[in-house]
Amino acid sequence: MIRARHRRSRRWSRRPRAGSVCALVSGGLDSAVLVGDLLRRGLDVQPLYVRAGLVWEKEEIAALRRLLRALRSRRLRPLAVIDVPMTDVYGRHWSTGGGPPPGFFTPDERVYLPGRNIALLSKAATFCALRGIPSIAIGILEGNPFPDATPEFFRALAKGVSLGLDASLRIRAPFRALSKADVIRRGRGLPLDLTLSCARPERGRHCGLCSKCRERAHAFRDAGAPDPTRYAAGPAAGGPAPAGALRASAAARARTTRVAPAKATRVR
């Protein structure tokens, strides 16, 4: 019985395609540079966005599509979007609109979304097994304090999904030893102005008041690179951080930094 079930399962997973990789993408700096890096290595890249029902996803997907259009490469496959709803699990949580997002000075350890990488990678693994994609790349960085972002977790999960899907899958975190500033330096030449890293974006602009905006602004500063980001308000835009304020005022909108549209970037 066990052998018969094992033979039948082979119909569901495809033979691995050498030289192909699935990149988990969010539209932010890390995943943008990850895609560019994989393309430069000569790999066929399948970008995959996992939609979980979080408040920033509509703006994030729009930014991601603009970014991928600018990365002109024959090895870049069309964006795939799959759903792993988490709103029923998280309930009234800041990530689902149940409250304001973490403020500008909130430490990274306090913005954890429990089980997020487990949900993303489990469904991504099924997606890859059905298409013969042998590995998943994720843009985890140095210093990530969360339990589902460790090398031990990735090894254990890869082993589990490979066993459960009867497929040989790898989970790769090539930026695990890099800071966000390192990633920005690595991504010079890519249209990083098209990326979005904000917990409460406003019509394509970064709010400038959340912890994601702080992390982004500080990373450009630490990289010694000009920050092309349009911030609506707050310290990232060169202004104060209003206590409890998350919506940009009319004056803050007038101060928004504008950047010229990015030209398409050919990744060889």
Which residue stretches match the model-derived regions?
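Active-site/binding-pocket entry motifs
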Residues: 86-90, 204, 219
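Charge-dense, low-complexity polyampholytic segments
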Residues: 136, 200-206, 225-233
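Local cysteine-cluster metal-coordination motifs and their immediate loop/turn environment
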Residues: 122, 196-218
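Short Fe-S-cluster ligation motifs
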Residues: 214-221, 225-259, 266-268
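A polyampholytic, Gly/Pro-enriched intrinsically disordered region
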Residues: 104-105, 190-196, 215-221
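Short, electropositive, low-hydrophobicity segments enriched in small/polar residues
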Residues: 30-32, 143, 212-215, 228
